[in-house]
Amino acid sequence: MANKLRNYTINFGPQHPAAHGVLRMILELDGEQIVRADPHIGLLHRGTEKLAETKTYLQALPYMDRLDYVSMMVNEQAYCLAVEKLVGIDVPIRAQYIRVMFAEVTRILNHLMGIGSHAFDIGAMTAILYAFRDREELMDLYEAVSGARMHAAYFRPGGVYRDLPDFMPKYEGSKFRNAKVLKQLNESREGTMLDFIDAFCERFPKNIDTLETLLTDNRIWKQRTVGIGVVSPERAMQKGFTGVMLRGSGVEWDVRKTQPYEVYDKMDFDIPVGVNGDCYDRYLCRMEEMRQSVRIIKQCSEWLRVNPGPVITTNHKFAPPKRTEMKTGMEDLIHHFKLFTEGMHVPEGETYTAVEHPKGEFGVYIISDGANKPYRLKIRAPGFAHLQGMDEMAKGHMLADVVAIIGTQDIVFGEVDR
């Protein structure tokens, strides 16, 4: 009697270099063809939602940076908008422009990392080197406004921590940098931060073209992405896909256009949409989104140059007074002390606030019972919905294509596991 053939079951991750963190998948294979892909999540669970419920509204803010740790300021933006909606704070218009500008800087940061690591996982090593060159300059912007290159905590309920600085930090000489290299590195750092941003926006589209030269018409890249991980528009909506995962399937849905927040209704930009819903279309959408982000950043920079003003609310029950005022005025000192010891008291109510995160729709749902801490804080992470589509997207493909599908989903486990 012949032995009955069984499918082969293997572990993918959590130590796999292409797992984008701590993804563990149980893969059932028929030969080298995927029969079932079962993602196991929770290995990076830190209880963020529960931790935030034990902290004041201001103390909970830095937890947002650590969710999707590639798109830090957009996480902060969603949280701040939710708190502002509950409290009813009017955010100064200059602060809104700064927020939108840094949200788009963050979108470019995310897509450079996503495309670079996706290509690297598939076998195209050069792209990530070009991507990280540009990411380095954008991380310098983060550092200049907040002092931190990743976990900025720059956005605050009511505005932003401080106005844009009048200068950009310069590289200093060392035994690794000669005078020629130093001059080249500091070339665009002679003026203000807005000058640096404008110079970046001038040269970055050419750098996107370089990335496209490496990948877009590359025969091997197309063989690894065209027709892989196809999702129909109907299934994308049924699965709760958002962002590029939805637009790549041909559904024109972008929260910045459909439900504008901050000053996105004043911005002129387009929404790139795919046709086939495969890995290649999603890659093209991300490339075009970076170009559109440059357009938005330019518009914000032009407006910020000619419109000075406050960058945080003057209601000191929700935002601290300036340090100079705090050291000279008794009322300001009391506000400062109360805000940082007791925290702000948010009126009773509940709100769901969503933003167009680089990975999709990132939502924050807050229930307030009138105390200085959230009664309940729920985070709607886009990657969580995308990962549940893994089984459907991978079924019938080869084992090597799993890596391409994980890369196109652009998953970060800080937000998936929370």
Curated annotation (Swiss-Prot):
Assigned keywords, A-Z: Cell inner membrane, Cell membrane, Membrane, NAD, Quinone, Translocase, Transport, Ubiquinone
Domain of life of the native organism: Bacteria
Quaternary structure, from the entry: NDH-1 is composed of 14 different subunits. Subunits NuoB, C, D, E, F, and G constitute the peripheral sector of the complex.
One Pfam family of this chain: Complex1_49kDa
Any one cellular-component term (Gene Ontology): plasma membrane
Keyword Ribonucleoprotein among record annotations: no
The reaction(s) this protein catalyses: a quinone + NADH + 5 H(+)(in) = a quinol + NAD(+) + 4 H(+)(out)
Enzyme Commission identifier(s): 7.1.1.-
Name the UniProt record assigns to this protein: NADH-quinone oxidoreductase subunit D
Gene Ontology MF terms: NAD binding; NADH:ubiquinone reductase (non-electrogenic) activity; quinone binding
Membrane topology (UniProt): Peripheral membrane protein
